[in-house]
């Protein structure tokens, strides 16, 4: 993994971190979810610290919006694709052929697992260097501090339809420690929009953002 900028001392642990439970073998994937759990926490810590330093005058609400934009599954999947991580994931053919949201989540999970082994192999500084390299440019993006989607949708719904957004959980998939919620939102007579996330709140935010984008209230920048 040259793009991590780190020479791994424990290559076997790196291989385990990129082996999904669907891969063949009695012990395949036994560490994958544990590494993913740790990597999620390391990523959140480093990005939060990075944002505090970069935006010293930002309020907690703005920092939370920026953090969520940087650590959601879509952002992680894009970074994973950029560094060529999908080609290194060992998984069963049924998983490797996933499309849509499930493929996004697979790549995001693998990137979190990679961050965990960076931390375990080289300490916090190794993980921090990698995260700063790929997340810091994104932290300055114009859309990183976009207003809370649910709040903006509620205001727009009142003005456009004299209505209140109605959210509904359509599905909940995945293990208890890493669920995937799909939520739809309806505003008056407008067509509903859907969104997914690792929490009910994240899915509601994604659905609200999807409706705002579709109706032209937000642009795609």
Swiss-Prot record:
Pfam families: dsrm, Ribonucleas_3_3. InterPro entries: dsRBD_dom, RNase_III, RNase_III_dom, RNase_III_sf. One of its GO terms (molecular function) is ribonuclease III activity. GO terms for cellular component: cytoplasm. Its main location: cytoplasm. CDD domains: DSRM_RNAse_III_family, RIBOc. Residues 1-123 form the RNase III domain. It is found in: Cytoplasm. The active site is at 40, 112. Belongs to the ribonuclease III family. Digests double-stranded RNA. Involved in the processing of primary rRNA transcript to yield the immediate precursors to the large and small rRNAs (23S and 16S). Processes some mRNAs, and tRNAs when they are encoded in the rRNA operon. Processes pre-crRNA and tracrRNA of type II CRISPR loci if present in the organism. This is Ribonuclease 3. The gene is rnc.
């Amino acid at each position: 993994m040259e793009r991590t900028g780190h020479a791994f001392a424990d290559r076997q642990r790196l291989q385990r971190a990129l082996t999904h439970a669907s891969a063949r073998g009695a012990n395949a994937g036994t560490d994958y979810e544990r590494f993913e759990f740790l990597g999620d926490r390391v990523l959140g810590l480093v990005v939060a610290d990075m944002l505090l330093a970069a935006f010293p005058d930002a309020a907690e609400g703005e920092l939370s919006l920026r953090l969520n934009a940087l650590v959601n599954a879509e952002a992680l999947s894009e970074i994973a694709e950029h560094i060529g991580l999908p080609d290194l994931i060992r998984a069963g053919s049924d998983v490797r052929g996933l499309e849509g949201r499930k493929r996004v989540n697979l790549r995001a999970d693998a990137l979190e697992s990679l961050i965990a082994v960076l931390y375990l192999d080289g300490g916090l500084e190794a993980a921090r260097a990698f995260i700063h390299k790929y997340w810091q440019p994104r932290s300055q993006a114009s859309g990183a501090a976009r207003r809370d989607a649910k709040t903006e949708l509620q205001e727009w719904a009142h003005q456009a339809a004299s209505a209140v957004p109605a959210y509904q959980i359509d599905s909940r998939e995945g293990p208890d420690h890493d669920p995937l919620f799909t939520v739809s939102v309806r505003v008056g007579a407008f067509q509903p929009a859907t969104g997914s996330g690792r929490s009910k709140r994240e899915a509601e935010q994604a659905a609200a953002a999807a409706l705002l984008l579709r109706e032209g209230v937000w642009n795609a920048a």
